[in-house]
């Protein structure tokens, strides 16, 4: 039987095709849970025992819950990312090929598996900046129709397609919008969807998105497949854990950053000052002393959550033989000698202790020594605000496909681990010593 949390997560992913939609959905959940919204441009007046959140760029969000007894506080931080590899629609997007075809001009966002985007119905989603009453207002849009398709070349015209697959994003990956179409047809569709005049639209951040819904499958319903599992699965798990856990002596923080898939080097990315800015402003409200802020950070702990590679059933040779991770076998701790992951002996020990308390199994991932592997957000965030940190994720197949696969049980494992984490208090008590208190 599939846990209700898994069904809820799949609905969450289906309803949020872009980072902007994900952030808005998290915002709505927090508001319904009683969190108060803050603006970075306004003065903050925080109170012990209260819950808050703040957004940046409409695509990143940090939520936090203030403990009641903050004389010796620290931060419990968990982070994930809101974006996924896809195709961004360029300005001056329409390409008209006489009276026969109208295409959209796009460019790759992140490291997607191109072939998975072909020969399937697609649509358009993102945010649109609209002029309303003298202000520029951000509006979400997701055209709920089969609108586009990227056609592959028939094997009769490309006999090497199954042997030498190679895709030029400027040639092979441009989506077909229709036959002959009037100029500005995409803008007309979006204006109609938002019920605004075309000249009110001043800007946009629009992306291609798949139309296929998430599903549960397998002979025992043991697998889930969906777009954007990386990393909305971790966003959902952290958010649920934040809402379920509480620590009277700690400040629990959930940070969801945009632009991880393109390096995080934006104002709303993990490499920005967003996390530092929020933690420092919280600290200034607790006690306006930098000394107390630095003391708190020294005792703080962070989980950087970004999905991990499961052993591939057809290609197990891509996995380190002694560090095999499988779907439905629990949360993955990721380790890298070159520090692409933040995990070290201390942080892995803390993760192991918390997992044992939560009754959650842990697995360990390391790349083969002859493979470079990917990177994530934890080490970038740590360059701005440094604390003990461990990189984790949930095991999945086909990472960066437009339709990925994971285990049906693992989301619940992450929620339980995050609940335990957010129900704990950390304290540096001596040289090489970090106490992990049950709150």
Q: Where are the model-predicted features located?
A:
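N-terminal hydrophobic/helix-forming segments and targeting peptides
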Residues: 1-439
């Amino acid at each position: 039987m599939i846990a209700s949390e898994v069904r809820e997560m799949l609905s969450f992913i289906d309803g949020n095709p872009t980072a902007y939609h994900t952030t808005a959905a998290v915002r709505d959940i927090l508001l319904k849970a009683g969190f108060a919204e803050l603006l970075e441009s306004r003065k903050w007046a925080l109170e012990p025992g209260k819950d808050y959140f703040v957004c940046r760029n409409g695509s990143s969000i940090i939520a936090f819950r203030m403990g009641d007894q903050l004389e010796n506080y620290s931060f419990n931080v968990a982070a994930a990312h809101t974006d996924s590899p896809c195709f961004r629609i360029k300005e001056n997007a329409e390409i008209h090929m006489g009276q026969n075809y109208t295409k959209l001009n796009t460019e790759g966002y992140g490291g997607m598996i191109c072939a998975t985007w072909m020969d399937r119905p697609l649509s358009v989603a993102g945010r649109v900046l609209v002029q309303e009453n003298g202000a520029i207002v951000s509006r979400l849009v997701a055209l709920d129709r089969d609108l586009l398709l990227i056609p592959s070349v028939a094997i009769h015209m490309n006999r090497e397609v199954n042997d030498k697959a190679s895709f030029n994003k400027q040639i092979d990956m441009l989506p077909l919008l229709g036959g002959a179409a009037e100029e500005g047809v995409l803008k007309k569709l979006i204006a109609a969807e938002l019920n605004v005049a075309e000249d009110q639209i001043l800007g946009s951040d629009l992306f291609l998105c798949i139309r296929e819904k998430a599903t549960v499958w397998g002979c025992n319903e043991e697998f889930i497949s969906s777009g954007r599992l990386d990393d909305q699965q971790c966003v959902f798990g952290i958010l649920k854990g934040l809402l379920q856990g509480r620590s009277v002596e700690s400040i629990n923080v959930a940070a969801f950053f945009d632009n991880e898939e393109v390096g995080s080097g934006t104002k709303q990315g993990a490499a920005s000052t967003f996390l530092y800015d929020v933690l420092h402003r919280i600290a200034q409200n607790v006690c306006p002393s930098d000394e107390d802020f630095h003391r708190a950070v020294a005792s703080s702990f962070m989980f950087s959550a970004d999905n991990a590679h499961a052993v591939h059933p057809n290609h197990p040779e891509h996995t380190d033989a002694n560090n095999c991770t499988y779907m439905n076998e629990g949360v993955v701790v990721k380790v890298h000698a070159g520090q692409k992951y933040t995990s070290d002996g201390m942080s892995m020990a803390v993760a192991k202790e918390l997992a044992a308390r939560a009754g959650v199994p842990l697995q360990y991932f390391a790349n083969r020594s002859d493979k470079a592997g990917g990177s994530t957000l934890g080490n970038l965030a740590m360059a701005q605000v440094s604390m003990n940190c461990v990189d984790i994720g949930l095991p999945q197949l086909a990472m960066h496909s437009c339709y990925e696969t994971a285990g049906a049980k693992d989301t619940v494992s992450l929620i339980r681990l995050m609940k335990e984490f957010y129900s704990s208090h950390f304290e540096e008590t001596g040289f090489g010593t970090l106490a992990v208190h049950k709150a």
